[in-house]
Amino acid sequence: CMSARTRPEPPFPSAKPARAETEILDVFDPDPGRQYDMRDLLGCVVDGDSFDEYRADFGRSLVCGYARIEGRPCGIVANQRMMTKRKMPGGKAGPSEAVNMPAVIYDDAADKTARFIMDCNQKRIPIVFVHDTTGFMVGRDSEQGGIIRAGAKLVNAMSNCVVPKISLLINASYGAGNYAMCGRAFDPFLTLAWPNARCAVMG
């Protein structure tokens, strides 16, 4: 790490987060059964209104976006800890909506995040990963939807990403979800964990 004397100045002026930092304790709940909106938590961390979400209406089980922290640009990949909905292609009855479980990575979100990681890598923007996941969705419907292909695409994008990566474990980080979110195996530049964080290859 660079000392404060040799560290380059941020390219943008720093700004206070849109929400007070103390509100993190009101937003986040360590109880695995409780839900919260990851965007509210990010609002307590990033500079002002700098968070620019990437494809907000697609792959909602993962929140991706560009932001600034203390004036320094970064990409953010965070698990969504609340139920979300996704549009499903319909048959005779037409399109329908399905409910996504909290903290689970679905195929559409994995696809979106892989593309976002590749974009950050091309733009030389460091990435912050905020872990709160129980892993990838399993089951017949998920496999028919392409979770294996999408999950492999996400892990491949991660393994080829050369920009600095920071991992923040705020709750659970289990199974293949830990790998997809830049777990220890990908040697992140820095790993931080809240006191209640739990991390394991098998959940």
Where are the predicted features?
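Ligand-binding clefts of soluble mixed alpha/beta catalytic domains
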Residues: 1-203
